[in-house]
Amino acid sequence: EFLEQSDIISSLNPSSLNTLRVVSYLNNEGVHILASVLRIGKFGSTTDNFSTGGLFCGILENGRLKGKGYNPNGDILTKTSTGILLEDCEIPNYKKVHEMAKSMHYIVPYFKIISWDIAINKNNMPVLIEYNTNKQGIDLQIAAGPLFGKFIDEILEIGRESH
């Protein structure tokens, strides 16, 4: 059995399960989304990993992809290997993706920062693939911007207190 991804997401590269990496941060005020990128596999690849030649593209708050994607060679790409312009793509049910990540973070509150790998299924609904509690990856900042944003001082203080 395997997950069938959304037609929209599959059109970007049908050979891999293309996933969203959503990074959330939990503090006393609640859960905040720090960054979101879409990871798209290299043409013919079965994985969407950046390290295996895939690309990633930042996602705007409305669910549309930013117009530029990045691969591990440092190339700036405006379309996928299937010819889809990144700026023309919108993630289905993007608001639900954020809601899902936020609600799941409360289940594991002992981790302050979590990276969620989420796919969009054939019914355009988010599905959790896995979550990562360390090594969030500095790479995604290339596409999404500074990871900690307005929380940088707060997060750095947590790091200082733990050492």
Predicted regions and their residues:
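Phosphate-binding site of ATP-dependent enzymes
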Residues: 1-69
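A short linear-motif detector with a strong N-terminal bias
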Residues: 1-3, 13-17, 35-36, 93-99, ...
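Domain-length functional cores that host ligand/cofactor binding and catalytic or interaction surfaces
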Residues: 42-55, 89-98, 111
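Acidic, metal/cofactor-coordinating or nucleic-acid-engaging core segments within structured domains
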Residues: 73-74
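C-terminal active-site "lid" helix and adjoining low-complexity regulatory extension at the edge
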Residues: 77-96, 102, 106-111, 120-163
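Flexible, glycine/charged-enriched surface loops at secondary-structure junctions
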Residues: 115
